[in-house]
Regions:
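Acidic, PIN/NYN-like endoribonuclease modules and their adjacent C-terminal/linker elements
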Residues: 30-31, 57, 102-160
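Active-site-proximal, substrate-binding regions of enzyme catalytic domains
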Residues: 1-92, 99, 110, 150, ...
Length: 160
């Protein structure tokens, strides 16, 4: 099980790789704010990835859960903060792409990773080729995924 923020769900759904979360982690838990961000707002904007994420919720492998303890974290979005709280509650990995959110999660003692971790794990488990992972990252970047040159180079080094 993992707790995911909106960005990894959107990025992976846009490139047709959302299924990797189910293959690698079994169940994904998201908070209601993340559902609003990914599905409701996405559908309002006509984003096809919103329908892919909605189907995963309907299929039951992405579960929506409300965070009981509402807490505001300085410098990060509500969805990231709620993802951190869910990961803490379930004692699982938090999937967050934004660096500020990742730092807060780490400060709270959580193991935090991002979308590239999913692709790296998919290569390690034989679910995706190295070339396929590189093409997927390039496609994600083309769809608006922001990544530093340093992190991109590290990803390429890690999967080789």
């Amino acid at each position: 099980m993992i707790a995911s923020d909106a960005s990894p769900l959107i990025c992976l759904a846009k490139v047709g790789k959302l299924y990797l979360l189910r293959e690698l982690f079994g169940k994904v838990v998201i908070e209601e704010e993340v559902k609003r961000e990914t599905i409701e707002r996405g559908k309002e904007e006509g984003a096809p990835d919103a329908l892919v994420i909605e189907d995963a919720v309907k299929d039951g492998w992405i579960e929506v859960e409300k965070v009981e303890e509402v807490k505001s974290f300085s410098g990060i979005h509500k969805g990231e903060g709620n993802t951190i709280l869910l990961a803490k509650k379930h004692e699982c990995l938090a999937l967050i792409d934004e660096e500020d959110g990742r730092e807060v999660g780490r400060a709270m003692g959580l193991k935090v990773r991002g979308s590239l971790h999913v692709l790296k794990k998919a290569v390690e488990k034989g679910l995706m080729s190295k070339d396929g992972a590189m093409r997927t990252v390039d496609e994600m970047i083309g769809d608006g995924f922001r990544i530093s040159t340093r992190i991109y180079a590290k990803f390429l080094e890690d999967i080789r």
